[in-house]
Amino acid sequence: MGLPRPGLWLKRLWVLVQVAVEVAVGKVLMTLFPERVKQNILAMGQKTGIAQNPNFAQDSWIPTFFSTQYFWFVLKVRWQRLEDATEPGGLAPNCSVVRLSGQQCSVWDFMRGNRPLVLNFGSCTUPSFLSKFDQFKRLIQDFSSIADFLIIYIEEAHASDGWAFKNNVDIKNHRNLQDRLRAASLLLARSPQCPVVVDTMQNQSSQLYAALPERLYVLRQGRILYKGESGPWNYNPEEVRAVLEELHS
């Protein structure tokens, strides 16, 4: 299973070079054509909802692009995608997760018979995850009679000691499981209406589902019916709605 280790490291090296070049070019373009680059980033932000969020003025997040923290986070995401173990129609990884009570369980524990199980991966510091949280809740309200839902809280997208945005939720990178459980418990104030679990500190589910910074899946009977594109730009709960409507028709 997976890539042979030498092959994996070669691919990681190539990705490292790619990200380094992208960041270097981005820095140059930001210096030479600052307004044009900012407008391009802002246009992408329209898709995530961050551009419409009054807490995020342009200068609170756009200048962080192509920074050192940006480089390391993007590199982590790209490296993670090399270990993506999922494909539509394939077997869904049965990863270990932890309930907010501290009890260990697995993703498959939340599947019931022939009912679809919607997985929502994300974190409180990911603005698009929170801005579309109400859309996800409406999915639960509309389809709870035919489907089950599970939020899997993963490592922070924009931790205050990482690639941080101004005026964002202030959560540092999780150093232990208790940190992650405390961060996930903040979602309870938003009345998620479905179980919330956290990824292990080995980030097993995040890696195998290539979920960082956020992603949606629909599973049924242990297999993947729908694999959403990775966030933040392509995180779209309405695509899940279309899948569930088709199953219900």
From Swiss-Prot:
Family membership, please give it. Belongs to the iodothyronine deiodinase family.
Q: Which InterPro entries match?
A: Iodothyronine_deiodinase, Iodothyronine_deiodinase_AS, Iodothyronine_deiodinase_I/III, Thioredoxin-like_sf
Chain ranges sitting on the Cytoplasmic side read: 34-249
Which positions form S-S bridges?
none
Per the UniProt entry, what species is this protein from, by scientific name?
Answer: Oryctolagus cuniculus
By which gene is this protein encoded?
DIO1
Query: What is the protein name given in its UniProt record?
Result: Type I iodothyronine deiodinase
What this chain does, per the entry, is described as: Plays a crucial role in the metabolism of thyroid hormones (TH) and has specific roles in TH activation and inactivation by deiodination. Catalyzes the deiodination of L-thyroxine (T4) to 3,5,3'-triiodothyronine (T3) via outer-ring deiodination (ORD) and of T4 to 3,3',5'-triiodothyronine (rT3) via inner-ring deiodination (IRD). Catalyzes the deiodiantion of rT3 to 3,3'-diiodothyronine (3,3'-T2) and 3',5'-diiodothyronine (3',5'-T2) to 3'-monoiodothyronine (3'-T1) via ORD.
- Give Gene Ontology CC terms: basolateral plasma membrane; endoplasmic reticulum membrane
Record SUPFAM superfamilies: Thioredoxin-like (SSF52833)
What EC numbers are recorded for this enzyme? 1.21.99.3, 1.21.99.4
Q: How does it sit in the membrane?
A: Single-pass type III membrane protein
How does it associate, per the subunit comment? Predominantly monomer. Can form homodimers but homodimerization is not essential for enzyme activity.
Q: Tell me what reaction this enzyme catalyses.
A: 3,3',5-triiodo-L-thyronine + iodide + A + H(+) = L-thyroxine + AH2; 3,3',5'-triiodo-L-thyronine + iodide + A + H(+) = L-thyroxine + AH2; 3,3'-diiodo-L-thyronine + iodide + A + H(+) = 3,3',5'-triiodo-L-thyronine + AH2; 3,3'-diiodo-L-thyronine + iodide + A + H(+) = 3,3',5-triiodo-L-thyronine + AH2
GO molecular-function terms, A-Z:
thyroxine 5'-deiodinase activity; thyroxine 5-deiodinase activity
Matching Pfam families: T4_deiodinase (PF00837)
**Extracellular topological domain residue ranges:** 1-12
Query: Where in the cell does this protein reside?
Result: Cell membrane; Endoplasmic reticulum membrane; Basolateral cell membrane
Give the residue spans that cross the bilayer. Answer: 13-33
Keywords for this entry? Answer: Cell membrane, Endoplasmic reticulum, Membrane, Oxidoreductase, Selenocysteine, Thyroid hormones biosynthesis, Transmembrane, Transmembrane helix
Q: What GO biological process term is on the record, naming one?
A: thyroid hormone catabolic process
Q: Where is the active site?
A: U126
